[in-house]
């Protein structure tokens, strides 16, 4: 029987995180982005970025977590989440800075072949626990308008659109996004 758990990412996880990001983007976004854009994503470049995000985070409130599936004979890194204080990348065009108590999810991906096993939910729950520790009371995340799976996943956890939108320029093609938000209860829900 497999066991899933979440832990803080370590610098040596950067390569696996980059591989998951690349695989997931090429699978989930293949109808959203031009094929040549996805084909030209550089795994080594992504790994260097993740190594820096893990090893030299801008603050103690910037975190990268990984989901691990532990089987009888091996363990596999199957997903990751990155978050921190909401910065300029969390903003809609011409929006003023968000308050200091707002967190932002920058990435939350589970490799498709490991989906539907609770890894995304565990990553999100662990992230919310850390937000509570860090004093965040609100969180935001951007989702592509065509990414129904991410929107449905976040909605199932209580997130909803906040009315903000933007479009990313991907090789002269505008890809619309909408922002979702959630209030963070300062106390975790009671368990039976």
Predicted regions and their residues:
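Terminal substrate-recognition subdomain of acyl/acetyltransferases
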Residues: 2, 156, 170-192
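Conserved GNAT acetyl-CoA-binding A-motif
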Residues: 131-143
């Amino acid at each position: 029987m497999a066991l899933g758990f979440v832990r803080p990412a370590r610098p040596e996880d950067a390569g696996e995180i980059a591989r998951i990001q690349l695989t997931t983007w090429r699978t989930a976004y293949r109808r959203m982005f031009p094929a040549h854009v996805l084909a030209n994503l550089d795994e080594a470049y992504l790994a260097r970025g993740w190594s820096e995000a893990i090893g030299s985070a801008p603050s103690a409130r910037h975190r990268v977590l990984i989901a691990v599936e532990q089987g009888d004979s091996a363990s596999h890194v199957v997903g990751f989440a990155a978050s921190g204080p909401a910065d300029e990348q969390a903003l809609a065009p011409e929006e003023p800075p968000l308050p200091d108590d707002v967190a932002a999810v920058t990435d939350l991906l589970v490799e498709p072949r490991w989906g539907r096993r609770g890894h995304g939910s565990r990553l999100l729950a662990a992230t919310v626990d850390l937000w509570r520790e860090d004093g965040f009371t609100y969180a935001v995340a951007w989702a592509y308008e065509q990414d129904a799976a991410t929107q449905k996943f976040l909605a199932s956890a209580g997130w909803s659109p906040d009315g903000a939108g933007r479009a990313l320029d991907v090789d002269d093609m505008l890809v619309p996004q909408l922002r979702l938000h959630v209030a963070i209860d300062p106390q975790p829900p009671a368990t039976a």
